[in-house]
Amino acid sequence: RMFPLSHKKEDTFIAGLSMGGYGAIRNGLKYHDTFGYIAGLSSAMILEKMNVADDSSPMFFERKSFLESVFGDLSKISDCEINPEWLARDMKEKGIPFPHLYLACGLDDPLLPPNRKFRDFMNELGADVTYEEGPGAHEWDFWNRYIKKVLDWLPLDKDSKEGLNSGNVGL
């Protein structure tokens, strides 16, 4: 093994911000046997908005043609593994425990409403969700503050001579 890392679920984390937050949540739920912890900052939980997208937006990433090139047929995204809510419902129905979730979003972020909705959805399913809101928008000032909170939330060995790690790195 080139890197002596733990392969245990409880030692494996995934995180992202904005569209990467969506990706971390989606992949963390899809690969729930791999990831024990998921963190999403200002996550782009905008699948409902995609169903009504057209090509009139000045922002390329909001255009229907762009979204279809990434996600495929937008009329089908609510009932497939692209949708984190669908994945979570499927896990719940099968009795699969959820990874621990940390979600945070700025009070001035346009993604605040969908993040609150996803938090509520996961709480209703009984997931272990740590959720925070604070001053800021969809910007690095917010993410820089909250990534530190993510690191504090994760089960890391903060006193190791090897630096911040899971405590499962063998040198």
Give, region by region, the residue ranges found by the protein language model:
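Non-catalytic cap/lid and distal C-terminal segments of serine-dependent acyl enzymes
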Residues: 1-171
